[in-house]
């Protein structure tokens, strides 16, 4: 199975198909899901009970301690440490504040849920009948199983396995976070990205200015290789260009733009 497959690769937080632990053949179903999960992870567990626990939601467990909650607790810290070490080594020019913002974006529930669904872990979950009957459950459920699986990998295979897998799975999320959450100099980041990925240099255009001379507001827009991006307002042209660059970076990564272009701030 291709580890990049997903029920919907464009939205990792869509409704997910769940495995009902109360089906007529729950054991056989769970075994099939465990095997599929190992294929996704590219790793054969020595302790299959550990992996089953990682995939089991509290609603599908015989008792609370048989669910993935304890593994989720450990996986959260393993994920955080691994990403922190990665960022610390890869981005020596970034400040503590920038690294913190990047890390927070990478390990967020949304990011983890999206990656888990791209991998196909949403097809490996084991839950109770009530969850599947209601068809209503928190979207954080998939990010929880992602953290639990990380913990299971850590226990069964060690930190190297976790480090290798996370660098493969989270590379896109790290690049996105670096480009949108990192250095406050968005113009510099946009220029580096545009030259590296698009072989082009951004240009900025004044679209509109408003207000009295002592309190003017400027609307600037960024353009890269003839593609125009959402403009942004600023108290001066330099500030507006920085914000326009931030909007461009967000659009280039299919993310929500951080600055409004409809009207100048009050």
Swiss-Prot record:
Oligomeric and partner information: Homodimer.
Transmembrane segments: none
GO molecular function, one term: rRNA binding
InterPro entries, sorted: dsRBD_dom, RNase_III, RNase_III_dom, RNase_III_sf
Protein name from the UniProt record: Ribonuclease 3
Reactions performed catalytically: Endonucleolytic cleavage to 5'-phosphomonoester
Binding site for Mg(2+): 72, 144, 147
Entry cofactors: Mg(2+)
Active site feature: 76, 147
Any one GO biological process: mRNA processing
Native organism: Rhodopirellula baltica (strain DSM 10527 / NCIMB 13988 / SH1)
Annotated ranges, domain DRBM: 185-254
The family this protein is said to belong to: Belongs to the ribonuclease III family.
Subcellular location: Cytoplasm
Domain RNase III: 34-158
GO cellular component terms given for this protein: cytosol
Top-level class of the enzyme under EC nomenclature: hydrolase
Range of residues in the leader sequence: none
Gene3D superfamilies given in the database record: 3.30.160.20, Ribonuclease III domain (1.10.1520.10)
Enzyme Commission (EC) number: 3.1.26.3
Main location: cytoplasm
PROSITE patterns hit by this protein: DS_RBD, RNASE_3_1, RNASE_3_2
